């Protein structure tokens, strides 16, 4: 039985949305047990509306929440915050992994202090899975855990992501690109130039050189490494572009009776494309580099987004990904 701690507090839509996602997800997985972390009264009220089999969950009560407007200093001030207790469950090996939709800065800071980083990792990075045109997934990191990074950080991200792609996504020869403003080797700031040089020297990864933001959704590269500042901008630009494009297509094909009639022929195709590039189906990001399986969902996550993050968390647990990454970093097998 796999056990996941779910911080159901702190996200924009409240605990009811998180618990509804938990209720739906656990019905699909007989091998899963959930620890719902948060305000006990609030959780019990939500469970009355969206019940879960009592043999498949327990409540871990907390008295505090670090909301989206909270300070990173709250990780010291609010010792009984749900996000703190959830990470402590991972540290104490009471659960196999965790997820939260709460405050990102608090999550990153608390994970650093409570769990610590793996061997030679100075800064952990957020890594989401991005859908692409080739019906595969592109890994992009860091997407905002850090505002500044070193070349060594980016090289470590490439190593860890390569292990993740091999073990979880089952591709032993993933291509790795460095996000830059052009594909030429001479492009970029000193960070990109030094990172390029170090990645080029690694013999056991498939480094293909510099790539651009437009390559994220094409499927021409499997893993893209970048600093957290650029990565966050890239991620949100891709999510926004996909959302606007799908909205405009829907608006256009429903703008007249004739277009509506014609669109019926392609309705299934439109739905397939919309589902492929809907970020809510890939809403989670793992905090890669800490000593535990820790996932962050969007603060604005709805039921579908939380279920997607639960699925990613369970996949990472089943593949024992943190131990494999730790072993790979120590033995230089990535």
From Swiss-Prot:
<dbReference type="GO" id="GO:0008654">
    <property type="term" value="P:phospholipid biosynthetic process"/>
</dbReference>
<dbReference type="InterPro" id="IPR003664">
    <property type="entry name" value="FA_synthesis"/>
</dbReference>
<keyword id="KW-0444">Lipid biosynthesis</keyword>
<keyword id="KW-1208">Phospholipid metabolism</keyword>
<protein>
    <recommendedName>
        <fullName>Phosphate acyltransferase</fullName>
        <ecNumber>2.3.1.274</ecNumber>
    </recommendedName>
</protein>
<dbReference type="GO" id="GO:0006633">
    <property type="term" value="P:fatty acid biosynthetic process"/>
</dbReference>
<dbReference type="GO" id="GO:0043811">
    <property type="term" value="F:phosphate:acyl-[acyl carrier protein] acyltransferase activity"/>
</dbReference>
<dbReference type="GO" id="GO:0005737">
    <property type="term" value="C:cytoplasm"/>
</dbReference>
<comment type="similarity">
    <text>Belongs to the PlsX family.</text>
</comment>
<comment type="function">
    <text>Catalyzes the reversible formation of acyl-phosphate (acyl-PO(4)) from acyl-[acyl-carrier-protein] (acyl-ACP). This enzyme utilizes acyl-ACP as fatty acyl donor, but not acyl-CoA.</text>
</comment>
<comment type="pathway">
    <text>Lipid metabolism; phospholipid metabolism.</text>
</comment>
<dbReference type="Pfam" id="PF02504">
    <property type="entry name" value="FA_synthesis"/>
</dbReference>
<keyword id="KW-0594">Phospholipid biosynthesis</keyword>
<keyword id="KW-0443">Lipid metabolism</keyword>
<dbReference type="InterPro" id="IPR012281">
    <property type="entry name" value="Phospholipid_synth_PlsX-like"/>
</dbReference>
<comment type="subunit">
    <text>Homodimer. Probably interacts with PlsY.</text>
</comment>
<keyword id="KW-0963">Cytoplasm</keyword>
<keyword id="KW-0808">Transferase</keyword>
């Amino acid at each position: 039985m796999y056990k996941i701690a779910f911080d159901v507090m702190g996200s924009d839509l409240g605990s009811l949305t998180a618990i509804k996602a938990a209720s739906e997800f656990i019905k699909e997985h007989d091998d899963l047990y959930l620890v719902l972390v948060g305000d006990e009264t609030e959780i019990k009220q939500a469970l009355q509306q969206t019940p879960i089999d009592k043999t498949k969950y327990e409540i871990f009560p907390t008295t505090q929440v670090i909301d989206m407007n909270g300070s990173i200093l709250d990780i010291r001030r609010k010792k009984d915050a749900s996000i703190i207790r959830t990470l402590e469950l991972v540290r104490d090996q009471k659960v196999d992994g965790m997820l939260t939709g709460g405050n990102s800065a608090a999550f990153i800071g608390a994970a650093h202090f409570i769990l610590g980083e793996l061997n030679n990792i100075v800064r952990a990075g957020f890594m989401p899975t991005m859908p692409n045109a080739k019906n595969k997934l592109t890994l992009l990191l860091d997407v905002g855990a850090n505002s500044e990074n070193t070349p060594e950080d980016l090289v470590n991200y490439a190593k860890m992501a390569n292990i993740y792609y091999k073990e979880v996504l089952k591709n032993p020869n993933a291509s790795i690109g460095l996000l830059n403003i052009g594909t030429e080797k001479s492009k970029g700031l000193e960070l990109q130039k030094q990172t390029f040089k170090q990645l080029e020297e690694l013999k056991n990864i498939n480094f293909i050189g510099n790539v651009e933001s437009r390559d994220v959704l094409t499927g021409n590269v499997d893993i893209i490494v970048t600093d957290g500042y650029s990565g966050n901008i890239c991620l949100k630009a891709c999510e926004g572009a996909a959302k606007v494009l799908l909205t405009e297509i829907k608006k256009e094909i429903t703008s007249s009776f004739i277009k509506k009639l014609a669109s019926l022929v392609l309705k299934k195709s439109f739905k397939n494309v919309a589902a492929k590039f809907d970020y809510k189906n890939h809403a989670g990001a793992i905090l890669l580099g800490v000593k535990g399986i820790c996932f962050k969902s969007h603060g604005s996550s709805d039921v579908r987004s939380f279920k997607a993050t639960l699925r990613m968390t369970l996949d990472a647990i089943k593949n024992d990904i943190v131990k494999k990454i730790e072993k790979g970093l120590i033995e230089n097998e990535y």
